[in-house]
Regions:
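Retroelement reverse transcriptase polymerase core
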Residues: 1-192
């Protein structure tokens, strides 16, 4: 936290019935997974709102029969507005990889492996002393995160640091082994 940071409590936002149902389902899912827990009070309270999930693009004719590209909305996603908390947070400047540099390094190779973490950020626990800062309010109560949520300013850097600590030895050994010996899935299968 920045030295001059003052806690802020946002009031609950009004949600229409459709958005309220989206929030209810997400809250139940997060509670069941143990990612959040109910809290009675906190100095820091953020509010929730819903944003559209974009599914793709379609083309729709307008009044003049011109074809206009339009985004398809497949549903809504609950998000927490951590902007005030993020302003008060001391920034972590851990280097994040640039996608173009990663692609340049990979373009020479014929085999690629992809690891996908289920709820990636949520695999990382939030420090007990900082959990109250992740508190949010919604029509179903006030909750705090046990696990790192999206939209915290330091979440990407923290996640990258953890992944590098976990996989650095594996990546160095695997990359050297697979690219020089067997450019196939054999090393990946042996490790699994």
């Amino acid at each position: 936290m920045e030295a001059d940071a003052k806690p802020v409590r946002h009031p609950q936002r009004h949600l229409n019935p459709k958005m309220k149902e989206v929030v209810r389902k997400e809250i139940l899912k997060l509670l069941e997974a143990g990612i959040i827990y109910p809290v009675a009070d906190s100095e820091w309270v953020s509010h929730v709102h819903c944003v559209p999930k974009k599914g793709g693009i379609t083309v729709v004719p307008n009044d003049k029969y011109e074809l206009i590209p339009q985004r398809i909305i497949t549903g809504y996603r609950m998000v927490i507005d951590f902007r005030i908390l993020n302003k008060a947070t001391k920034k972590d400047h851990y280097p994040l990889p640039f996608i173009d540099q990663m692609l340049e390094r990979l373009c020479k190779h014929t085999h690629y492996y992809f690891l996908d973490g289920y709820y990636g950020f949520s695999q990382i626990p939030v420090s007990a002393k900082d959990q109250s800062k992740t508190t949010f309010t919604c029509p179903f109560g006030t909750f705090a995160y046990r696990r790192m949520p999206f939209r915290l300013c330091n979440a990407p850097a923290t996640f990258q640091r953890c992944m590098m600590e976990i996989f650095l030895t594996f990546v160095k050994r695997f990359v050297r082994f697979s690219w020089t010996t067997f450019p196939s899935m054999v090393p990946l299968l042996m490790i699994a």
